[in-house]
């Protein structure tokens, strides 16, 4: 800052000398005019460097302060509120699925025990859906046991093939990798009702890569599979041509580079280093020590 003040005083002295020399009748000698112009030019460079460094430091300080303010504005309680909202939504969906379970089993609902009929939606959050489906299967009579448990309870539980659900049905599920057909073996017998319902459920959950017909010795050709088969496509990234950033204003930087490397040996004995200029280190003790030489050169004439 002191260098900027000294450079400004030198600029004012040089301009005053030039103005006085032009008002005189005889004018000013050439070498004295060149000397004053040289000192004026060097002082102007020092002043511009100091101003640029000050502006650069202010910009850095403002950026740091804005980041600190944004961090302080973050409230950790917002995350807790979001978690509570998600749990409330989960409980609501569970109660809806429990009511759907009762609607999908009308024959079982008339013959179940009173304890199974008075299940409230409020208890759906605490009791898992798998246990509720087990209670319904236990309460059902023997003739409709396999069909109600395998064909209708699985769409409610969203294709959950856990061991808990398979315990009461005593069944074994077999998936054919060639034909993508799911078959269920119960006590050594095949049940097509379970096969059809499970296949429909699994198709609703995730679509198979290829669909084939179940006729013996006949498979769908590749041409017929083309309309149904949709290959996975990778997500396309935005082309770099669309992300055009605004061009930087390099006029001031180029001017400063030309100023820094313009031979400042008469004012400050230092190297024209761009990194030191950007960091704000422009003036040194040698510059302050050589201020007396500039003033003597101006006052000499």
From Swiss-Prot:
Q: Which InterPro entries match?
A: IER
As for family, the record states:
Belongs to the IER family.
Q: What is this protein called?
A: Immediate early response gene 5-like protein
Species whose genome carries this gene: Danio rerio (Zebrafish)
